[in-house]
Amino acid sequence: MQKEVVSGLLIPFLGTSLGAACVCFMKHDLSRGVQRALTGFAAGVMTAASIWSLIIPAMGMSERLGKLAFLPAVIGFWFGILFLLLLDSLIPHLHMNSEKAEGLPSKLARTTMMVLAVTLHNIPEGMAVGIVYAGVLTGSADMTAGGALALALGIAIQNFPEGAIISMPLHAEGKSKGKAFSGGVLSGAVEPLGALLTILSASRLLPVMPYLLSFAAGAMIYVVVEELIPEMSEGEHSNIGVILFSVGFTLMMILDVALG
C-alpha cells in the first residue's frame, strides 16, 4: 500500500514535468487555439474530478445524517471557494495572455507571477489527491485505492498540458529552455508536497473527511470558473475549448468509474 500511495502522489507531478519538457523539443510557442483546447481539457478533468471523486464520496460518507447528508459537502465546498478567493486576492500572480497582474501589488518579475498563477491552482489538486489517499489509509469505506489512482491519473493527464502551457510562454518571455522547464516543474511541486502533508495528518482527518473532500472540490471549481473557463472561451473559435472540456470531463468520469 505504501508503494501505491507514493506512486499516487508522484503521478500528478510527473504529468506536470512531462508537459513542461515540451519546451525542450517544440520549436514554436503554442498557438491560441491549442492553448484554448488544452485549457478546456484541463477544466473538464478538474470539474469531473470535483464531482465524481470528491463531492459524491463526501456525501456518501455523511449518509448517517439522513436528509442532511448534503450539509458537510455544502459547508466544505464554500470554504474551498472562499479559501481560493482569499489566496487569489493576496498572492501576486499573472494569468496567461494577461497584461495586468492580480493579487497584492508586487515588484515580482512577470515570469515569476506566471508561475505563481499555475502554482495557485495546483494547491487544491495536491490537497485532493492527499485527502483521498488519506481516506484509503485510514480505511474509509467510501475511499478505494482504485478511486484514488483514478483521481491521481486524471490530474496527471490534465497537468501535462498545464506544464506545457506554463513552460512554453516562459520561454517566449525570454527564459532559456532550461529555466522555462524548471519553472514548469516548480509550479507542480506544490502538489506532492501538499498531498504528503495531508496524508501525514491522516489519522486526525477522518472525522472531518467529508468537509475536506468538498473543500478541495470547491477550491478546484473556483479555479475552473475563475481562470480556466474564461481562458478557453476568449476570442474567436472557442468551440474547441468546449469540445475538449467535454472530452476531459468524459475521460475523468470513465477513469473514476472504471478504476474506483
Segments predicted by a language model, with ranges:
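Intrinsically disordered, metal-sensing/regulatory segments
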Residues: 1-260
